[in-house]
C-alpha cells in the first residue's frame, strides 16, 4: 500500500490579493522512498527517489553548508582521535569507538551535519576560512555510513571558487576516490547531490524558484532525541504562519492574525499524529 499525504493548501497570492484553496494529493510511495517538491502556484514540481544519495552541497557562493541524507539513514561522525594527518589511522574497527553522531539542522538549510562542530568566526565545522586566498580548507576527517550501509572515511579537503574538493575511501584505505564538484554550475538549485557508493554527482532538485515546500524525511528532536520523521520543510525565503484551534480550517482566511516565519520546519511533522494510523489535526491550517 502506498503511503500518501493528502493536504489542503491555502495559498496567499500577493500579486492579486486573494486567497485560493486547493486540494492536492502527494504520494511519497511505499516506505516514504520519495521526496516531493511543491509549488503553491503550479502544484507538484518534482517527485523523485530520496534513497539514492548521501551528500548535499550548497550551491550558494556564500555558503559552505554540506548536508547528509540523515532522514533516510545516512550517519555521520567526526574522527575525534586526530586531524587530517590521521587518514591512515582509520580502519575497519574505528566505527566501534565513534561518539556523537551529527545531524542536519531542521530549521535552517544553511546548517548541515558537516557544520556541526563550527566554533564561530572563520571556523565552518568541516574547515576553516583563509582570509588571504578566500579558500575554505578542510581540517577534519569524518566517518560516514552511506545510504546503502557502507562505511567510508571522508576528507572534505577544500572549497575554492565554488568548487568542493574531497576524497573518500573504504575504512581500510581501499578504493580511494578523489572528487571535485563545481557547485556554481548548479547555482539555480539549492543543493547539488552526491552518491558515495556510486561515485556520481546527482542533479535532482527543481530550480529553486519553482518550489515552495518539500515533503520529505528528515531528523528532528522528538522528546529530546533525534528521530526520523516525515514532514514538510519550506524553501529559503518562504514565510509560513500556523493557525491552531480553527473550527473550519478550509474557510479560515484571517492570515493577518498570525506571525509568519522563515524557519524551514514551521509546518514540520506534527500536523499529524499516529493513532494506529496517521490522523491529521482537523483544527490546524497554515498560510504560505
Which stretches of residues belong to each language-model region?
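Bacterial Sec-dependent N-terminal signal peptides
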Residues: 1-25
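Surface-exposed, beta-sheet-biased, low-hydrophobicity segments with strongly acidic/polar composition
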Residues: 22-288
Amino acid at each position: 500500500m502506498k503511503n500518501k499525504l493528502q493536504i489542503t493548501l491555502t495559498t496567499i497570492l500577493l500579486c492579486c490579493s486573494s486567497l485560493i484553496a486547493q486540494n492536492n494529493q502527494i504520494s511519497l510511495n511505499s516506505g516514504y522512498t520519495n521526496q516531493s517538491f511543491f509549488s503553491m502556484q503550479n502544484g507538484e514540481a518534482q517527485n523523485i527517489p530520496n534513497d539514492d544519495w548521501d551528500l548535499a552541497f550548497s550551491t550558494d557562493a556564500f555558503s559552505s553548508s554540506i548536508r547528509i541524507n540523515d532522514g533516510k539513514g545516512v550517519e555521520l561522525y567526526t574522527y575525534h582521535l586526530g586531524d587530517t594527518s590521521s587518514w591512515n589511522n582509520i580502519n575497519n574497527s574505528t566505527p566501534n569507538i565513534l561518539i556523537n553522531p551529527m545531524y542536519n539542522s531542521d530549521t535552517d538549510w544553511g546548517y548541515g551535519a558537516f557544520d556541526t562542530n563550527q566554533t564561530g568566526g572563520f571556523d565552518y565545522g568541516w574547515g576553516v576560512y583563509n582570509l588571504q586566498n578566500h579558500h575554505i580548507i578542510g581540517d577534519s576527517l569524518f566517518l560516514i555510513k552511506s545510504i546503502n550501509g557502507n562505511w567510508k572515511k571522508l576528507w572534505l579537503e577544500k572549497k575554492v571558487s565554488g568548487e568542493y574538493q574531497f576524497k573518500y575511501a573504504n575504512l581500510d584505505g581501499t578504493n580511494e576516490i578523489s572528487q571535485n564538484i563545481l557547485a556554481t554550475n548548479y547555482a539555480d538549485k539549492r543543493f547539488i547531490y552526491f552518491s558515495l557508493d556510486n561515485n556520481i554527482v546527482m542533479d535532482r532538485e527543481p530550480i529553486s524558484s519553482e518550489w515552495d515546500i518539500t515533503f520529505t524525511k528528515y531528523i528532528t528532536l522528538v522528546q529530546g532525541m533525534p528521530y526520523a520523521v516525515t514532514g514538510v520543510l519550506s524553501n529559503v525565503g518562504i514565510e509560513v504562519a500556523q493557525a491552531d484551534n480553527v473550527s473550519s480550517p478550509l474557510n479560515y482566511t484571517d492570515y493577518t492574525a498570525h506571525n509568519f516565519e522563515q524557519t524551514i520546519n514551521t509546518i514540520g511533522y506534527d500536523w499529524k499524529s499516529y493513532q494506529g494510523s496517521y490522523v491529521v489535526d482537523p483544527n490546524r491550517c497554515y498560510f504560505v
